[in-house]
C-alpha cells in the first residue's frame, strides 16, 4: 500500500471513530481531537482559523474536507520549520519578532519576488505590533497566502 493510501486509511479510521451516527460527518468541536489522534497538534487559534475556513455554517465537517485539510497541513508541516528558520534572519533581537519593512524589502526584491501589492495584501489581516510581526503570525500568513501556495 502506498504511503498516501496508508495515511488516508489512518485519517478515515480516526474520522470514523468520532462519526458516532455514521452520517459521514463530525462536529467542528471534535475536529481538534481527531486531528490530534492522527499526529497533528493544532493550537486553539489554528482550530478557530480552520473552523472559519471549512465550516459551511452547519457546524459539521465531512471526511472529504477533513482529509483535504490534513493532507494540506501535513504537506506544510516541514515547510513551517523552514519558514521559522528563515524568519530568524529578520529576528534581530531574538525575541520572535521581525520588522515588517525589512521583510517587505527582502520579499519584494530578492529571489522569487512578490510585488509590493502582493506583500501588502498578504499582510493586510496579520496581527502586528509597532511595525513588527511575530514568527507564529508570519508562519500563519505565509501558509495561508496564495502567493506561496
From Swiss-Prot:
Record-annotated EF-hand domain positions: 6-41, 42-76, 78-113, 113-148
Molecular function terms from GO: calcium ion binding; enzyme regulator activity
Subcellular location: Contractile vacuole
Source superkingdom: Eukaryota
Chief location of this protein within or outside the cell: other
Annotated Ca(2+) binding sites: 19, 21, 23, 25, 30
Keywords for this protein: Calcium, Metal-binding, Repeat, Vacuole
GO-annotated biological processes: microtubule cytoskeleton organization
GO cellular component: contractile vacuole; cytoplasm
Xref: CDD domains: EFh
Function in brief: Mediates the control of a large number of enzymes, ion channels and other proteins by Ca(2+) ions. Among the enzymes to be stimulated by the calmodulin-Ca(2+) complex are a number of protein kinases and phosphatases.
Similarity comment text for this entry: Belongs to the calmodulin family.
Protein name: Calmodulin-like protein
Gene that this sequence comes from: calB
Amino acid at each position: 500500500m502506498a504511503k498516501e493510501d496508508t495515511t488516508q486509511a489512518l485519517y478515515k479510521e480516526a474520522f470514523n471513530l468520532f462519526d458516532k451516527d455514521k452520517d459521514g460527518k463530525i462536529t467542528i468541536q471534535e475536529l481538534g481531537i481527531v486531528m490530534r489522534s492522527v499526529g497533528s497538534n493544532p493550537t486553539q487559534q489554528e482550530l478557530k482559523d480552520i473552523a472559519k475556513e471549512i465550516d459551511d455554517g452547519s457546524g459539521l465537517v465531512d471526511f472529504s474536507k477533513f482529509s483535504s485539510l490534513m493532507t494540506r497541513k501535513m504537506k506544510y508541516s516541514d515547510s513551517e520549520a523552514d519558514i521559522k528558520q528563515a524568519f530568524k534572519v529578520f529576528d534581530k533581537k531574538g525575541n520572535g519578532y521581525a520588522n515588517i519593512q525589512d521583510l517587505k524589502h527582502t520579499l519584494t526584491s530578492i529571489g522569487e519576488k512578490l510585488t509590493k501589492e502582493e506583500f501588502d495584501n498578504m499582510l493586510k489581516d496579520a496581527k502586528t505590533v509597532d511595525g513588527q510581526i511575530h514568527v507564529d503570525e508570519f508562519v500563519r500568513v505565509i501558509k495561508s497566502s496564495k502567493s506561496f501556495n
